[in-house]
Structures are given as C-alpha cells and as structure tokens.
Amino acid sequence: MELRVGNRYRLGRKIGSGSFGDIYLGTDIAAGEEVAIKLECVKTKHPQLHIESKIYKMMQGGVGIPTIRWCGAEGDYNVMVMELLGPSLEDLFNFCSRKFSLKTVLLLADQMISRIEYIHSKNFIHRDVKPDNFLMGLGKKGNLVYIIDFGLAKKYRDARTHQHIPYRENKNLTGTARYASINTHLGIEQSRRDDLESLGYVLMYFNLGSLPWQGLKAATKRQKYERISEKKMSTPIEVLCKGYPSEFATYLNFCRSLRFDDKPDYSYLRQLFRNLFHRQGFSYDYVFDWNMLKFGASRAADDAERERRDREERLRHSRNPATRGLPSTASGRLRGTQEVAPPTPLTPTSHTANTSPRPVSGMERERKVSMRLHRGAPVNVSSSDLTGRQDTSRMSTSQIPGRVASSGLQSVVHR
C-alpha cells in the first residue's frame, strides 16, 4: 500500500535516525524529486519535531542549511519534509579508511566554522556538533557542507535585545560525550564557546582517526561519561595535537579561553586554518579525499579493462596467420590500428590522497557504500557559495578538474 504525506509526498524506506524521530526516503510526487521525511510519533513523551522544524524555518536561506519543504501532522505522526542530502562526514570518514588528509580537514574546517557562526547569528547554539550532523550536498552542491539536526539546539540570547541566557551549573550532559566540551562535562550551561570547542575535537578526530577518550569501558552510562571527562581533562591540548600543525592547538586553546557569554572571533579561527592551507601550498579546488578515492577506483577499473582488451588483441594476433610472424607494431599497422599502451600505475599528485589507492581496496570500499554513490557531480561550488562572501583569491575556473570529483557517496540522509 502506498503511504502518502501531505498529499504530495510518497513515503519510502527508512534511511536513518535523528536525535528525535526516524528519517525516511520520500518522493515529491509533483516534482518527481527525492526528499527526506522525518517522522515523530505524536504520542511520544517529549514531542520535539515541531520545535525543530521551527528552528529550521528560522535558519532558512543560510548557506549549508537544508531546505524545509513541508511540516505538519499526518495520522499518528508529526512530519517534516526536507531537502535530501548526501553522506555525512562520518560516512565519508569510514569510506576513507578513517583518516582524512590535512587538505581535506582544512577544507572542511573552513565551512564548518561558517555553519556554526551562522547558527549563532540566528540566536541559537547547536549543542550536538559531531561528524554525523554534517552532510555533503548532492549534485551541483556536492562540495557544500550542510549542518543538520536541531533536536538539541537551544536559544542562547534574546533575538531583539541580544540579552544572553544566564550562567548555570549542575546541568546534565546534552549532546555526544565524545565531542562535548570540558565545561559541558562539568555541568555548566552551554554557550557559543562549547559548539566551537566540540568542533576542535571533531577536527582532531579527523586528523588522528580516533580520540584518546574513545573506547573507554564502564558499568553505566554515567560512569562512562565520567571516565571520558577525566581522560579529556587530563590530556593536554599540546599532547592531543602533537604531530599536527600548531593551528589545531591554537584553535582549541582559544575556544577554552572564552568566557561564558563571549562572542567568538570566527574570522580569526577561519583565518588560522586558511593561512595554514596557503602555507601548505594547497589549492581551493574542492577535491576532497573521497573524490580521489572514487576517481582512483574508476581509473583502476579503466586500466584493468584496457589490459583485458590488450590481452585479447594479442591472442587474436597469435591466431591470425597473416600477422603471426610480424612484430606487434607491424601487425598493428597491418590492421590499421595502434598498439594499446600497457596500463600505467595510478599516481595521484593531489595533496588529498594519503596513499595511492589500490584497485581492489578502492572498489571494495565503493561497493560497501554503493547505495550512496552519486556519479559525476562536477566541482562547481564557488568559494563565495561556501562562505557567503566573495573571495577571489580562493579559486579560479582553471583550477577546477572536469568531472574528477563526484560527490562520492549518494543519498544517505539526515540523521
């Protein structure tokens, strides 16, 4: 039986879960486009979707904020229909064998700081900054980082007067313990500084592959949170960031130095990483690690196909009496064809690749996420699209490789 929402959207299979409610793949019947549909049972103890949809509506129009198509109730469910996005940064991190290159981390950091700044400019803090809540766009927006899931977001100041919420203590931990700020662990009311500190841990997670406080065991959730808190507080920032550019330690030290109601200097933090990016000689071509892996696997498959055709060609030579005694170049001329050159190993020159992708492992990874592959998304998001302002130093048309960077993995979804 076909399930419909709002008399316009067809409900499909479940594709994920958010902080409150489940997410389904849907279809806009009139437009023929795929959408994401978030459902929440109306009988739930603490209904949240209506509040979340209001926050999304307040955020509409911002760069990297998903478009809301429809909100309402349908039968026993509260419903929110949203723009369908691509994979989360956590999905892509796994796709890239749980390690991002410095170039990819810096490209992401620039956009992620801007997303958090935009939310703060709208008088809200996110309170659950983690890789799962940042998604890449699809198609022409395949290089744009989106921020999602406002189920735990909170207003931190009055929209008219900008009066900040009061300082409080003895608060329960809200968010994800792995990325929570130290003040959040200590029970202090969250503010702008905490979103940015969480982002610092996310960036080091991308650098390191894991954080020192991951994998700790405890009998209860509360005890586990305490162990994470202890490990986080006893790990100096310089130790956490050892072996990586000093900008990461500078970023975290800056965030931890902020007072409760301070307005962070977002431009300073962005510039920290932009200066590092330029010193490293990287190019703002928006080719991320996952683009290189996808392209590398594709190139390897092409090489294998050429090699197969070459073998068949040689086999035909050996069976053809007219060409059997001729050298391969001469036999090629006799048939009016050129000899196929042997395949050359793939040697990526971009800073984004940590190692040369092997054909088998690349294709194996691609197969595991085959549901998410989005073929042929061109790299055509300009830097002004990403930051909301024009910056002519960042990218020129000549830097954009044709169709090298497909957005990697398709339509996973809002969590």
UniProtKB/Swiss-Prot annotation:
Ranges for region Disordered: 301-415
Catalyzed reactions: L-seryl-[protein] + ATP = O-phospho-L-seryl-[protein] + ADP + H(+); L-threonyl-[protein] + ATP = O-phospho-L-threonyl-[protein] + ADP + H(+); L-seryl-[tau protein] + ATP = O-phospho-L-seryl-[tau protein] + ADP + H(+); L-threonyl-[tau protein] + ATP = O-phospho-L-threonyl-[tau protein] + ADP + H(+)
Disulfide bond annotation, renumbered to this chain: none
This protein's record includes keyword Manganese: no
Domain Protein kinase: 9-277
Origin: domain of life: Eukaryota
Similarity comment: family membership: Belongs to the protein kinase superfamily. CK1 Ser/Thr protein kinase family. Casein kinase I subfamily.
Annotated protein name in UniProt: Casein kinase I isoform delta
Organism: Rattus norvegicus
Lineage: Eukaryota, Metazoa, Chordata, Craniata, Vertebrata
Gene: Csnk1d
